[in-house]
Each structure stands twice: as C-alpha cells, then as structure tokens.
A protein has these predicted regions:
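Flexible loop and strand-edge segments within Gram-negative outer membrane beta-barrel domains
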Residues: 22-24, 212-216, 227-239, 245-305, ...
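Extracytoplasmic beta-strand/coil segments of soluble accessory domains associated
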Residues: 70, 74-111
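Gram-negative outer-membrane beta-barrel transporters
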Residues: 356-357, 394, 492-503, 522-605, ...
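N-terminal periplasmic "start-of-domain" segments of outer-membrane beta-barrel proteins
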Residues: 33-64
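Structural signature of Gram-negative outer-membrane beta-barrels, strongest in the C-terminal barrel
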Residues: 351-361, 365-502
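A beta-strand signature from Gram-negative outer-membrane beta-barrel systems
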Residues: 127-174
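C-terminal beta-signal and adjacent terminal beta-strands/loops
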Residues: 506, 600-607, 615-616, 623-672
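Membrane-embedded beta-barrel scaffold of Gram-negative outer-membrane proteins
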Residues: 302-320, 434, 441-444, 470-530, ...
C-alpha cells in the first residue's frame, strides 16, 4: 500500500527535529549518571522540568517497603491504584481521574503496548532491577522524543539499571533473596559485565512464589465481625532480562531482551452475606516476550537522531470454571498478541535558544483468540509529531502537534472500524520571575485522544465497531521552588504545587442490552476533574545522620456530567477520593538506615450513586523497614527487615477485594 512507502520514507529520510539546546538536552546515559549522584544535582535537575513530574530513584526505591512498580506509584500525588485483592490481583493506575487507558507506560524509553484491552498490569513489574520511576502529567519537557511520547494524557517511565563500574572492575554481582509472610520467597540475581570501555552487558533474573493466603476481617450484613482467609491468590513468576549497552562517537546504543512468565489465581470478590461460599478458582497464565533496541547520536552540532525498534509477543490463557465458582460462566480462552514498532526522532538546534523536532512512529498490532465468530483484527498506526522549543533563559516555551493515523483490518468483511485521522496539540510554558529566586511558574495545555481498544471494537457479542475515540483536555498551572544549601543542616528543598482542570468526552463504557448476559460498548459521558497536587521534598544533615523527607497531597473533585436528568448528575465518580496523601521518611547513620512510609486515601464512593450504601471509609497504612550493611573486604552484605501495615488496618481499595493486614519480610543482598 502507498501508506507503507510513505511511512518508510518519513522514518528514514525526514530531516531532523528539534529538541532543547545541547546544553539543556540530556542523553539517557547522562540521566543515569546524574540520578546516581548526590541530591544537590537531583534538585538542580528538578527546577528545569517544564511539565509536572514526580520521581523516585536509586536509594529511595531500594528503601520503600514495596515489591512492584504499582505499589511504589501509590506514593505519588494525583495517582489512584486499582488493586483487585493483594498479591495476585490485577493492579492498574489512574492518574488525575482520567482513566487507566490514558496512561502511557514506558520501559527503558519504549512504550509497553496492550492493544487488546489498553491497560498494563503494573503489579508484574518488580523494583528488583529498577533505577528510576518517573511520572509525567501531560508529557516530558524535552521535545527530542518519539511521537508515541506525545500520545498519552500522562506517562510513567520505568528505567532499569545501567552498569556502572568502579576503576578497572569488570564485573558487578548482586545476589538477593527475600522471604516473608504468605509463604513468599523471591530470589534474584544481577550480573553486570564490562567487555571493554565501550560495551557492557547485564543479566537480571528473579523468581517469586507466594501463596497469597492472608486473613482479613470485616463486618457482615447482620453486624457481626467475621474472619476469613483470602483464597486463590497464589503467584508463580519468572522474569529474565538481558541487556547490552554500547558507546559510539557522539552517541550510544542499547539492546534488551525481556521474558516474563507467570501463573496466578484471581481471588475474586469476597461476598459479605455468605463469606467463603464462592471459591473463585479463576486462573491466568501469561507469557510476555519482547526485544527492543535504541540508537542515539549527535551527528552534527545542529542535528541529532534517536531511533527505536521493538518486537513483542504476548500470550494469555484465562480459565474460569463454573463448577468451582457458580457466579461465572465457563471460560477457557487463549489470546495471542504481536506488535512491531519502529521510530525515528530528529532534532534540529537552529540557535542555542531555538530548536525543533520531527518524529515518526509506526506500529503494527495483531490479536488472535479462540472465540466464536472472532474477526482477528490487525491495526496499523502511524504517528507524526512536530515540536518546537524556545529557551530565553528565564522564559521557556514549547509547542507540539501530533498527527495520528489508525487503520484497522479484520478477516470478516465489513467488520472493521475503518480509518481514523486526528490532530492533537499541546503547549507548555515556564517562567522564572526573579533571577535570584529559584521559583518558577509553569503551565500547560494538552488535548489528546485514545482509540478504542481491540476488545472495545471487536470482542465477540460485546464489541462495537462504531465507537468514537475518547478525548481528554488538560489545563495545568503550577509553581516550583528548588534550592540547595552548603554547610547547612537543610541541604536541599524542592516544592511543587499544581492546580489542574481536565475534561473527558465520549467516554467508552460498557452498557447492558436487552439480554442481561450481553453487554455492549458505547460512547457516553462527560467528566470534569478539578484538582490540586502538592509535593515537598527535603534533604537534611545532622553530623553523621542524614534524613530525607517527602510529603505528597492530592485534592480531586471528579464529577460526572453525563446525564442532566440523572439524580446523580454532578456526583463524584466512583473510587476517586476527595483527599489523599503520603509521607516518606528516610534516615541513615553510617551503615544503618531506616524507612517509614504512610499512605492515606480519603472517603469516596464505590458507585455512580453518591448514597450512604456506596460510601467507602478512608483507609491508611504505616510501613517501616530497618537495614544494616556489612563490609567484608570487597564484599558488601545488606540485611533488611520490613513490616507492612503495622497497625493491621483492614481496608479495600476496590469494593469486596480485601487487602492484606500486617505482614513481614526479610531481605538479604550480597554484592560482589
């Protein structure tokens, strides 16, 4: 087809785009090195961010009493995690109440795709090999990036460790094992090797097993308290990553192979009226494999190139047996997804204060399933972004325009959703009013849309090929303050406050038909979100004692204005609390360190109807850890003890999906 030829030409012959000037632009290599340095450098980086961003990196991630990326994201403001029941349950993220489908998830710079249902289960990504987790509202503030990076309302970037060697050392080895409550065992291995000054590699692997069995209590319908044990929450998981890193004159490259294999049970809802009646024996098997590579080079002072490529294969087997759970129908389905992705981003630096960029992406997705009358859809997506950036020292401006072309095809004639062509803009600005005061005022506007997923369009009996895209419009105004002090007990202080207003239109939802066993997908809904995010971070020093503090707060009023005739018109949308916050306190003294963390989620409703029957009480948890590091010649040994949910808070993130109470864990790491 002609569009294929146009794509190839645009990917490899389009002249470069712009990013920020070379002084302000950071390669992934420099990012890694900076994030490993002291907090003074980290603070200086923070004040240059034009878009609202929250970062957890290095030792902060290491000290958190959490296993997965989803659990770590709970400490960011403006984030709601939907957790369907503890260990084995699905974990998805909702940022600023716009929905999980509007969150882009990137792994080492390339997006993790799921064309089938549009969401990524962040519970399957552990922190074992993670160096940095960043959350951006809107988009990253650098314009030298793939077009994909412009296509989401918000984005999560996970960056894994990059090998760093001291002196002439050629190998780093980190052997770890964790064990604790719920029969949890989690061994891991990280081996980093330096071939020469230009090429290095890393192998990271881990295995985890947990029974997922934990006690929980709640009040029954008759008012009596009862205790039950969470069933069918076991997980067996294996992750294996192999990465290579290389340097070339004026640039670098990296390549990675990733394999994830798991079997898990889905514990299902706990029915209050008859606890323990339904056994919930649903099982899921997953295999996720991808290989990806990236090349970045500064060919000329005025031109740089960033090229990415990826192939991914995902297999999912879901089994539900009504003989074990009478609330379900028999399901024994197998799904297979394939994805091919290629990207070329060009950066032109016209003047030190003016740069431009042009990025072209192509993505192909295919979905196969053993469903009756399945149409076997494929999707071709072309994204082209044009962006420009102006840096007048105290005033910085950015603007971008994203073009999206989506073409679906199916084996069944006339069953496809046709072709979509959309343009979506964004504008970002930041201004420093006073030269000597490290205070910045920032603002952004962004309009973006999401295509209906392949399930939304083509799932047998449920899909609707006539669905329209779902649009979001974002407005944000905020301030940032960042400063460091020398020879002072307060070493650094970072503050950011953002107020925002979002709209979601043509929201895609499931609605029942005349047959109660068949639902269909429709466009319905207008949601308005008004909110405030605030974060303050401090680094303190009292002699040999070092202390870091992080406070986050979120206020959100997310109203449903879908149906003016509804009694619940203008009510708070389900599962969005008005207030939420978190606290992280880290302390260290010589070879000892401790960490305390607190999470609070305020009152909310569990359904559209804002009535007492749907009211959910606030919940909060306290976690604490203590670690000691031993040095024996060239070997370091770190022992960590953790306690989660210290006061055994009984709570539910999602109605009828109880979370674990108090739990314990011991970690041992040997670093050679």
């Amino acid at each position: 087809r002609s569009w294929i030829l146009c794509l190839i030409l645009s990917l490899f012959t389009t002249l470069p785009a712009i990013s920020q000037s070379k002084v302000r632009h950071h390669t992934s290599l420099s990012d890694t090195l900076l994030k490993l340095k002291e907090v003074t450098i980290y603070s200086n980086r923070m004040q240059k961010k034009m878009s609202p961003v929250q970062i957890l990196s290095g030792k902060e991630l290491e000290k958190l009493n959490v296993y997965s990326v989803a659990d770590a994201l709970r400490y960011f403001s403006g984030v709601q995690i939907k957790d369907y029941g503890g260990i084995g349950g699905l974990k998805t993220v909702n940022i600023r109440s716009m929905g999980s489908h509007h969150v882009g998830v990137f792994y080492d710079g390339i997006e993790l795709g799921n064309a089938q249902n549009g969401v990524v289960d962040l519970g399957r990504f552990s922190l074992d090999n993670m160096e940095v987790i960043s959350l951006y509202n809107g988009q990253k503030s650098a314009i030298f990036q793939p077009a994909k990076d412009y296509s989401s309302a918000s984005a999560i970037y996970m960056q894994t460790r990059k090998p760093l060697f001291k002196g002439e050392k050629k190998n780093n080895l980190n052997i770890g094992v964790k064990g604790g409550s719920f029969s949890t065992i989690n061994p891991s291995l990280l081996w980093e090797h330096r071939f020469n000054e230009r090429i290095s590699s890393s192998i990271s692997t881990e295995y985890m097993y947990t029974s997922g069995r934990y006690k929980f209590t709640y009040a029954k319908k008759d008012g009596y308290d009862t205790t039950a044990v969470r069933q069918n929450g076991d997980v067996r998981m294996l992750r294996l990553e192999n990465a290579f890193f290389g340097k070339v004159p004026k640039g670098e490259w990296k390549a990675k192979a990733y394999l994830y294999n798991s079997e898990r049970g889905y514990p299902g809802a706990a029915v209050r009226e008859e606890p323990g009646k339904f056994r919930h024996q649903d099982r899921q098997w997953d295999t996720n494999l991808f290989v990806q590579g990236s090349f970045q080079n500064y060919f000329k002072p005025w031109y740089s190139l960033l090229a990415n490529g990826k192939y991914a294969y995902d297999y999912l087997h879901y089994l539900s047996d009504p003989r074990l759970d009478v609330t379900t129908m028999y399901v024994d389905n197998h799904y297979r997804q394939q994805e091919i992705y290629a990207s070329a981003a060009h950066l032109f630096t016209i003047y030190p204060w003016w740069s431009m960029s042009l990025s072209n992406d192509f993505q192909w997705n295919a979905l196969r399933a053993d469903l009756i009358d399945f149409v076997y859809p494929t999707r071709n997506t072309i994204l082209t972004s044009a962006a420009t950036s102006f840096d007048f020292n105290r005033l910085m401006l950015q603007a971008s325009l994203l073009y999206t072309h989506v073409d679906d095809n199916t084996r069944t004639k006339g069953a496809n959703a046709g072709t979509k062509n959309k343009y979506t803009p964004s504008v970002i600005a930041t201004w420093q009013p006073l030269t000597k005061l490290p205070l910045n005022v920032r603002a952004f506007y962004k309009k973006v849309f999401r295509m209906p997923t392949l399930n939304d369009l083509y799932y047998t009996f449920i899909g609707n090929k006539d669905l329209k895209p779902e649009y979001t419009t974002q407005y944000d105004v905020g301030i940032t303050f960042s400063h460091t002090w020398n020879n002072h007990w307060l070493k650094s202080l970072d503050l950011q406050i953002d107020g925002y207003y979002n709209e979601v239109d043509d929201k895609i939802i499931a609605m029942p038909t005349s047959n109660q066993f068949r639902w269909t997908m429709i466009n319905l809904g207008h949601v308005e979100i008004r909110g405030l995010d605030a974060a303050i971070r401090g680094e303190w020093g009292f002699g040999k004692v070092e202390l870091s503090t992080l406070f986050n707060y979120t206020y959100q009023k997310a109203q449903d204005f879908t149906d003016p005739t509804s009694e619940w018109y203008g009510g708070q949308i389900p599962y969005i609390p008005w207030h939420g916050g978190s606290i992280i306190l880290n302390g260290s003294y010589q070879t000892w360190s401790c960490n305390y963390s607190f999470i609070y989620t305020g009152e909310r409703y569990e359904a559209v109807a804002n009535i007492p029957e749907n009211y959910a009480q606030p919940w909060y948890t306290h976690d604490f850890s203590l670690s000691k590091t031993f040095q024996w010649e060239k070997t370091r040994i770190r022992v960590t003890a953790e306690i989660n949910n210290i006061f055994n808070q009984q709570y539910e993130v999602v109605q009828c999906y109880p979370m674990p109470g108090t739990s314990f864990k011991i970690k041992l790491n040997v670093m050679l």
